[in-house]
A protein has these predicted regions:
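Catalytic-core segments of class I nucleotidyltransferases/pyrophosphorylases
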Residues: 52, 56, 84-178
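Short, conserved, surface-exposed binding loops centered on an aromatic residue
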Residues: 68-71, 80-84, 100
């Protein structure tokens, strides 16, 4: 992507993805930004242009989440949406709920406006006693902000948060590279 500026932010201790995002506030400024976790691997980023464009069709959108239908939701934040065109409208999110109310897993790429920082500052610690982005998005929804959802469909991606998952992603990449 042309004119793309990437900033890396490290945490001294695990205080949550929301805390890491809050630490980036001074770099973001007043423009929308793409947020990508460090523990997810997408072998094909061809969806990204459409994902970015989808967040720009309505100036009232505060954020766009990426979701995928999943049978097993353990370890995922979930979204509940209302069907709309061109994107679904989010009306509820929850971070790793014990009893999910939908099968829409939130994937770890977001497009957000700086309003998220105010929401993070108003959000209490959540799952694992950490500040969570999903909880801040819930705060935005409570404040009547508009959040949309982009369906990732059946595209492949890997959670690489553990050694075993990272190995599977490397193995998959190796197979692609040696075809």
């Amino acid at each position: 992507f042309e004119k793309c500026e990437i900033k890396w932010i490290s945490q001294n201790s695990p205080m949550g993805f929301g805390h890491a995002l809050l630490a980036s506030k001074k770099f973001v400024g007043d423009k929308p930004f793409l947020l990508h976790t460090g523990d997810a691997y997408f072998p094909n980023y061809s969806f990204l242009n459409n994902f970015i464009k989808s967040s720009q069709y309505d100036k009232k959108i505060t954020g766009t989440i990426l979701f995928q239908h999943k049978k097993s939701l353990e370890g995922f934040g979930i979204a509940q949406t209302k069907k709309s065109v061109p994107l679904d409208i989010v009306f509820h999110v929850a971070e790793k709920p014990k009893k999910p109310k939908s099968n829409l897993a939130i994937l770890p790429i977001y497009i957000l406006k700086p309003d998220i920082f105010e929401a993070l500052e108003k959000t209490s610690l959540g799952h694992n006693n950490e500040l969570q982005v999903t909880d801040a998005i819930s705060t935005l929804l409570d404040l009547n902000h508009k959040i949309n959802a982009y369906n990732f469909g059946n595209n492949k991606w890997f959670d690489i948060g553990t050694t075993r998952q990272y190995f599977h992603a490397l193995n998959y990449s190796f197979k692609i590279a040696t075809k």
